[in-house]
Amino acid sequence: MSNTSYDTYRESVAGRADVEDTPELVAYYKELAALKTGALWTVANKIEPWQPKSESVPVLWRFRDLREHVLRSVDLVTPEKAGRRVVYLNNPGRQDVSAAVGWLYSGLQVMHPGEAASAHAHSSSALRFIMEGRGAYTIVDGHKMTLNANDFVLTPNGTWHEHGVSAEGTTCIWQDGLDIPLVNALEAGFYAVHPDLQQAVTHAVDDMPAIWGGKGLRPHDGNWSKPYSPLFKYEWAPTYEALVRHSKVTEGSPFDGVLMHYINPVTGGPVMPTIGASMQLLRPGEATRAHRHTGSFIYQVAKGSGYSIINGQRFDWTERDIFCVPSWAFHEHANASASDDAVLFCFNDLPVMQSLGLYREQALAENDGHQAVL
């Protein structure tokens, strides 16, 4: 005899479902279940919460803890066998979908000098943020980009792309960021391996940054109609310079310090339709106020050290550490140095939230905008 309860989510609030189980109703619910249907009022309060309830939890992944394990994978598997030699970040609340937070995937990939992964394409949008090493490169639809530390490169939905490290380089580690969980949730994922395993470089090396990377300039013959940025590679040096210059003439955001978004130079919008990226600078000693918003965010420390408080938990971070902020979680950041700035790279699903009209933001009102640490 089943003891299933159907009134678990009752709420004694006007306008909300508040139906108590009775023998007659339970029998009715079972009849509906046999027809592969159900009574909305038994689940309405669950599937339409008062506010977002993320299954993800805040996590800090320390690079000093992960690095040796990432490097060890080199001795255990080859790129040819693994496809992509990656240690992925698995949020305790999202292990069922292999997500780092929300619907975002992240992992650390390593390659030795002279290694190259096979060219492939997939429905997921992706980016790579270089953490250490020199000589890394990525080829996207025949465009080859050379990469240095703190550069990041796009490998958009549907593009042929591959990664490698030149024979003259050093062992490289980078962070992968993809929307795999989102694409799979939408049941829209495809994957393909290039028929030749490697693609030909059909354009001058670093041509796209050269064509599209001019500050405030657009090439006269620059025709681009694809839904993602043609820039492909976003370099650290000009990004950091822009942050520093901006910090000298503005107070910045009370919640994010000096925040700048990477953009598609054609549209001024996000770099890809489903993944946004940004870089923010915290001045020496700066501590932001807390706020929360819809959307999942993954941060990597590009420079400096400090801490973030996420839903009352303090996470101390330093360069190359990675941490996540789940949707609708209060968070604030602080630079621990009194003399040097700190810089955080971030990728997120903000474009999805905004394009679907789901973005909401709220500042913490009490305690002068700062959370109590639990």
Positions of predicted regions on the chain:
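A short hydrophobic beta-strand segment most commonly corresponding to one strand
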Residues: 109, 127-129, 154, 168-188, ...
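A short beta-strand-loop-beta hairpin characteristic of the jelly-roll/cupin
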Residues: 112, 116-149, 155-159, 164, ...
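Catalytic core of Fe(II)/2-oxoglutarate
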Residues: 144-147, 159-178, 313-318, 322-352, ...
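Contiguous mid-protein beta-loop-alpha structural module that forms a pocket-lining wall or clamp
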Residues: 157-212
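C-terminal structured domain segments across diverse proteins
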Residues: 266-269, 275-279, 291-294, 304, ...
